[in-house]
């Protein structure tokens, strides 16, 4: 997978923002 970490893990299709995970 291509999960990214920004305080919590976000996996596609979600993505990291300054406030955490966000849906597309």
Curated annotation (Swiss-Prot):
A molecular function GO annotation: toxin activity
Membrane-spanning segments: none
The molecule here is called: Conotoxin pr6c
Q: Which organism is it from?
A: Conus parius
Principal localization reads secreted
Q: Where in the cell is it found?
A: Secreted
Q: What is known of its domains?
A: The cysteine framework is VI/VII (C-C-CC-C-C). Displays a mini-granulin fold, a structure composed of two short, stacked beta-hairpins connected by two parallel disulfide bonds. This newly described fold is derived from the same cysteine connectivity as knottins (ICK fold). The name 'mini-granulin fold' comes from the structural homology with the N-terminal region of the human granulin.
Write out the tissue specificity statement of the associated record: Expressed by the venom duct.
What cystine linkages occur within this chain? 3-11, 6-16, 10-21
Modification after translation (UniProt): The three Pro-12, Pro-13 and Pro-24 were found to be not hydroxylated.
What's any one GO cellular component for it? Answer: extracellular region
The alphabetical list of record keywords is: Disulfide bond, Secreted, Toxin
Establish whether keyword ATP-binding is in the entry: no
């Amino acid at each position: 997978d291509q999960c990214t970490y920004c305080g919590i893990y976000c996996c596609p299709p979600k993505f990291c923002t300054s406030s955490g995970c966000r849906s597309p």
